[in-house]
Amino acid sequence: MRQFALRSSGIIILLILWELVSRTNLIDPGLFPPPSQVISALVSLTLSGQLPKDVFASVLRAVAGFILGSMAGLFVGAVSGRIRAFDAVLTPVVQVLRPIPVIALVPLAIVWFGLGETSKIFLVFWGVFFPVWVSSYLGISRVDKNYIWAARSIGVRREKLWLQVILPAALPTIITGLRTSISLAFIVLVAAEMAGSYLGVGYRISAYHLVFQIDKMMGYIVLMGALGFIADRTFAYLVNRTLPWYQLSVNQD
Amino acid sequence: MAGHVVVENLGVSFTGKDKTIWAVKDVSLEVKSREFVSLVGVSGCGKSTVINSIAGFVPPTVGDVTVDNQPITEPNSRRGVVFQSFVLFPWKTVRENIAFGPHSRGVDEKVITQSVDQYLKLMGLMNFADHYPQQLSGGMRQRVALARVLINDPDVLLMDEPFGALDAQTRIFMQEVVLNLWESTHKSVLFVTHDIDEAVFLSDRVYVMTAAPGSIKSVYDIELERPRGAEIRLDPKFLDYKRELYEEIREESQKVLGPLPLF
Amino acid sequence: MIIRNFKLLLGILTLVLFVTGCGKVSEEESRVTLGQGMGVLNAPIFVTNEKNFWESQSLQVDVRPFVAGRLALDSLIAGDIDIATIGDTPVVYGLFKHPNLRIIATVMESNRDEKVIARRDAGIDSPGDLKGKRIGVFFGTAGEYYAIRFIEAQGLSREDVSFINIKAPDMVAALSNGSIDAYVSWEPHVQNGLRALGENAVVFLNSDIYTETWNLVTTAEFFNNNPEAVRRVLRAVVRGVEYTNANRKEAIDITEKQLGLSRDVLENIWDDYDFKVVLSENLVATLRNQGEWIQASSDLSKGKSLPDYRQVIIDQPLREILPVAVSIP
């Protein structure tokens, strides 16, 4: 409880400072609306039903893109991390595509998939795929061979190694990649929604920017931050809940 | 009488960047059924490679490795391996680590639970059954690793510097644990170490390896009476063995490190 | 004694610096950063750049292109650029938050620049068919204002269609792959859409609802600190506009190069644009109309009265340079 109070005090001080700076008219409150105004904008947008729809649309896109992207990244990373032939063929392809900043693909996604859900999910997929690929590739190709030997010498059959030894041994590295991708998913999503849409948090940020509705724009920016934070916490909670050993291993190494 | 290990003219090479490196060359040794045999040598002489070949992890480049006249093709739970770094599975609890072997061989769950409990009790780990390995001390971890292997009732126990990562007190305690276990179960044991005291204390026979690429330099039969207790370490015969082995190893160290510098 | 001499010396030095400094200002080059929104309506500025009419006014102009005047406005507000060419709608929006924006001249008027382009296979053959359709609009630009007026002229309201916010250059692709049914924009984007869709495209134009003005916009601070630079920019642009009108073929060539539209297309639409340097009553009226529209349709001006749009226009420099161009009192 004391921890919590201490942790939130920083945020509260930030809010008070922000409110004070806006109120003193040092900066035009029209350009830098105080938190009270931003919060009231958020409240009225929530009551009007617009904000929940935006959040729902954005979260759905982020989750869909994240699941597809991380599954593909995990699969390709695992296969190329463990099987020579796949490594030789796939890894150069991935390495060539990986440095392309995903934001640069936004216009291409519009040309290929239009402005609908497909292009947004595709962009999130792309953004998530590479960090998950990297972490799965590294995690799986660098699994300590002693784990495999230890398992084999107590009678674990070769075909069972994948699920019972290699994957769990690589999991801590993979989880790091997944966690990085969560914040990346939101960054990419905002960029994708800003490029063209009629629903979603990123779309509102861009639309309110263009018509100078700064309090609402800031409200949606704060909301984006909150969504990212909640997603990260939820992920951490689920990991600790389902993999109690994970935290122990991380602290150890 | 199972667990008779014979290694004949074993050579193992690895292909490096532009040349072939021999890890061991021309190693011949034997572990008879229920015998406790140690392999000592300086660091990097290829002791572990010998263990890895017998375990089935690394195929011999030349020579033969057989257990009970069967050539070794792949790892098998008849040959249990205990590693220096324990190699417990961090995603499994102590109980799950020990049960992993019988579990993957499809042993009946009830039987598994019973025998896991038995080994937990034997190793003094009953209160730590649901802990993860990361929560245990080094000595406890190595006991889990031993239990994980012994539960499969192997014929041969291959121990690769199992106490190398432990502090001196824990090490002596673990040596006694292993000796007691061996005396009650009578597995064939091949024990790799660079600690001469440990080798003499535990073994029926000690093989000394040359520096890399390792081959067998000499063999000593340790004729000390069994069962052995802590006091045997002060026995003059014990000290004689130690002295002789020490000289052998010293020669090999000098090959690797060069003569002592003169100050 | 020494002190008195020292003071004298200081006084002389200051005087010398002042005189030479002052003398230098009128001779010295002025540096101006100009942001230009890309479109056919910016043609006279393209010409001024290409012929470098800035140079003869002792101006060194750093020109930065923007996809839309609306985005140039952000840079102007942030202080990255000194002067920008922008349509009227973004300025009206911006004035609610930035009362220091100033218009120094209109360089073009047109009631045929903004258009609606739609896909026939989306079931759109007449403007009334837009009901219920997805229409791409670049929010905050004149395109948005035109789109609303167009819809209203069909007896429809904003809620009868779904507007999708898209940057103008992305509209062609979005329409081509069917993620929108229509879009509203300025040229070259409608011509580009026509080229991409061919027979499948239908274009609607309502020239009675809105006359767009394309303006040179700066901030009160920049004008107050650099009145001479502003005058020079105006003189150069006046020459650019005259040249554009006198050398139609060359002006089209220059614009073609800037926008990538073909000569034929530009020839066809060129007369839709009235290039002229003016400050007219029409500008004040269109600013006020849009101000009232924004006041009614959004809560941007909540609790505030509309700005005095006459005060937004700085007419004095243009009045000095080209008196006939100023028709506001």
Would you name each region that the model predicts?
Chain C
Residues 1-9:
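Bacterial N-terminal signal peptides that target proteins for export
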Residues 18-21:
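C-terminal motif of bacterial Sec signal peptides marking the signal peptidase cleavage site
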Residues 23-25:
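Bacterial signal peptide processing site
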Residues 27-157, 162-165, 181-187, 201-210:
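Short, glycine-/small- and polar/acidic-enriched structural segments
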Residues 89-90, 163-164, 169-257:
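Pocket-lining segment of extracytoplasmic ligand-binding domains
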Residues 140-159, 236-268, 306-310, 320-325:
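Ligand-binding clefts/hinges and TM-proximal coupling segments of bilobed small-molecule sensing domains
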Residues 224-301:
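Secondary-structure end/capping motifs
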Residues 295-329:
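Conserved C-terminal helix/tail region of periplasmic/extracytoplasmic solute-binding proteins
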